[in-house]
Each structure stands twice: as structure tokens, then as C-alpha cells.
Amino acid sequence: MGNIRQAKKNRSSAPKQRMKRKGVLKSGKKKINVLGNAIIAENWDRKATLTQNYRRLGLMHRLNAPSGGSEKRKTENGLEEVASSLHIKGSVDAMKDSAISETLVERDPKTGKIIRVIRKDDEQVEIAGRKVRSSNPLNDPLNDLSDNEPEIKPQVKKAANQIVQQLEIQADNVAPKKPRHQSKREEEWITRLIEKHGDNYAAMARDRKLNPMQQTEGDLRRRINKWKIYTTIPSQYEVCFLILALWT
């Protein structure tokens, strides 16, 4: 049989007391402080949405590729139309872009169907008993590529706006992270381990008196290697004493 108090709580109409999680929205997503940076906070428009603010500042609110529709902004003629990369031009638009010219064709004498289009470069010349095209006498396959193909231009990086430039300067001026230095007590503890066990890291890990926190063999090796590096480098005071000794 269950506890009577637990059964009463289950029957009670009072809501269950639950701890509030800080930094978490009702949807369960993590709450992000968008105004954590001073530069962004100064240029933030509270009337606009997060996406609108990020687009205006020249930033990306989502690193993933767009997976749906985008917001249509208002223009003078109405709503903005987003150009689709998969849109196929109609026949009228295609004829406007294409250049109209005349060319020679070879037809089948029986059916009258066009067999091939004769271009100026396709004129055949007989060389060493073989008929080859005058434009490609060596039958080079690379020469068959069309010269009219558009060249792939390298992507030109857009000039960043002032806010992005300020953020980049702020990121470049961040002070480098200082390396962690071992304390005096840690150095004394390492010296006692080395005096007792030498280079036997497995014995150091099993020593319950000198290693009460049960540091692993790999962790002890890293600490001792770091200690050896700093002990071999002379301190500033030692360097000063050496310089004075040389001068005297």
C-alpha cells in the first residue's frame, strides 16, 4: 500500500510546486540575451523583431540554411518578390536574351530532317588522309569546350557596415587567455610524489596518502610534465642574480 500523504497530494486540486528554471523559456528553449554586447544594445530597435534587427545590423540570426519562406517587406509598388533560383524563364524572356543569327545545317536527303548544324569552326580539312575540323586539327577534347561559356567569377566579399566593423575590431582586441600557473602547494605536492615514486605514475595514482583525491595516472603525468617545464626555466630573480654575478 502506498503512502497516505502521497495519495492525498495526488487527489488535491492544488497545483504542484515546481522549481522555475532560470534562463529557459516556456517552450523549453534556452533564453538568449541578445543585448549582452554594448554595440548591439545601442543599435537595437525594440519595436522590430529579432530577425529584422539582425538583418539591419548585418548579422545572421541563424547559421543554418533557410528552410522556408522569408518575410516579404513592403515596397513602393507593393510587397517585395523574392527571386527564385529554380525559376525557369519563359520562351518570350529566353528569346529576348538569345541572339538571333543565321547558320548552315545539314539535312537528311530522304527525310529532310536536320542531322547537324554546320558552324564556321566545323569546316573539315583533310590532313594526312584524315578529315579533321579546322578549328581542332589535333582532336583535342579540351578544345571542344565552348568559348562562349561564362567565366566563373570569384565571389567578391561585400563591404561590412559600420556595426560589423566595430564588432570585428572588438573581437580582435580581446585579451589573450592567460595560461594557468601551478600554485606553491601543488608544486610541493608534486615534489613529494616524485621523491617517493620517481617516474612511476601508476604507483602515484594508487598512493592513497599522497594522492587522496585519486588523480588518474594521465592527470598526474600532465601535471608533472608542466611542473618540469616551469622548474627548468629560471625565474626573473634568478636571471637578475646571474646578471649581477657576471658583472661583478
From Swiss-Prot:
Keyword rRNA processing belongs to the record: yes
Record PANTHER family: HSPC111 PROTEIN-RELATED (PTHR13243), NUCLEOLAR PROTEIN 16 (PTHR13243:SF1)
Naturally occurring in which organism (per UniProt): Emericella nidulans (strain FGSC A4 / ATCC 38163 / CBS 112.46 / NRRL 194 / M139)
Subcellular location(s) per record: Nucleus, Nucleolus
Subunit and interaction comment: Component of the pre-66S ribosomal particle.
Gene Ontology cellular component list: nucleolus; ribonucleoprotein complex
One GO process term, biological-process aspect: rRNA processing
Gene transcribed to yield this protein: nop16
Function: Involved in the biogenesis of the 60S ribosomal subunit.
Family, per entry: Belongs to the NOP16 family.
Top-level taxon in the UniProt lineage: Eukaryota
One Pfam family from the record: Nop16
UniProt-recorded name of the protein: Nucleolar protein 16
Keywords assigned by UniProt, alphabetized: Nucleus, Ribonucleoprotein, Ribosome biogenesis, rRNA processing
Record region (Disordered): 1-27
